[in-house]
Amino acid sequence: MNSEMSRNVVSNLKKMNVKLISVTPDAEKNIAYCARVSNPNNQENEKIAGLLKYCINHKHWSIFEQAFMTLEIETTRGLAAQILRHRSFTYQEFSQRYADSSLLADQIPMFDLRRQDTKNRQNSIDDIDPFTKQEFEIQIQRHFASAMDLYQAMLDKGIAKECARFVLPLATPTKIYMSGSVRSWIHYIDLRSANGTQKEHMDIANECKCIFAGQFPVIAEALGWTEHS
């Protein structure tokens, strides 16, 4: 990204993007088939909704490890640190050691500003005065531009990307491929779409939930999920 472009890092709030990369074919049928391993004469039974709901209601979670889904998530380095804590998944993330960070976006997106909840350290409240918010947003935009100018100047002088990246803000965009079993996705979505999760991470989890409901409709219905819930 050239110097002129980096001086104009004035970006609107960026919606996190999540999209499907791959999923086990006939996943729900495969899960039901494997669940009937001890009843081989009934394994070809195509009636699976009742069985999958039974497994969920009685917490027979291991059977949901028989199918997998990979999603692509565009987010920030700050939120990526939260996502990567879910250790039952496997990940590939955009490498700031290998590639120029401006390859993902030529702007660092502005993030939302909310007030700290004094009763819950892991919660924030969206009631900041608009003038206060605007004042800080202007300063943040300048900070982002300065950081990107410094980053590019270091690269131009031959500083290694693995060193120059340390001047970049946590709001810098990144991309993750997140792969896991249906069981892992159920747990992740259930946890991160609930209250107590940072809003931006909750938005990602809800996008994952919509994709999950589209790919695993029988399981989603048994969980009480829909594409829009």
For each feature predicted by the language model, list its residue ranges.
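Family-specific signature for flavin-dependent thymidylate synthase
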Residues: 1-229
